């Protein structure tokens, strides 16, 4: 199995896990947050619905796109259903870009603005959405436990 195929598999599974976690929350709690400085499950899903498009551009062009309209784009995904559909579509497009990524470019490096600036290999970049999905899955599961639901969904 190629590295890219494994990343696609992990990414698709991570998206399914996040969607299942949000679906398990009571509908009236999907936009609930435990504190003013916290993020709701819906807000996190808004990010996950739009972020793959940035990663596609990064993979295709080798540089990070501008985030000029990021907040407005997130806010335009104002329902769970829209976020879920958009996340699936955008992640599908990202998985296409990952699976088509050439082996000989896996060690290429790119500078990213995250964490004050960092350099990552393209192999690491291919896995960023899967990592981000898993990160938010944990946050959503924590919200679930704060609401008294201790089941693994």
Regions found by a protein language model. Name each.
Residues 8-12, 16-19, 27-72, 112-153:
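Short, contiguous alpha-helical
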Residues 11, 15, 22, 87, ...:
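Hydrophobic alpha-helical core bundles mediating ligand binding, dimerization, or RNAP-core interactions
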Residues 25-28, 99:
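Short, solvent-exposed, charged loop/turn and helix-capping segments
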Residues 75-112, 124-134:
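Acidic/histidine-rich alpha-helical segments that form the ligand environment
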Residues 7-8, 84:
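Short acidic-aromatic active-site loops that bind/stabilize oxyanions
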Residues 1-5:
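Basic/polar N-terminal segments that are highly enriched at the extreme N-terminus
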Residues 23, 30, 104, 108:
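Flexible, active-site-adjacent loop/turn segments at secondary-structure boundaries
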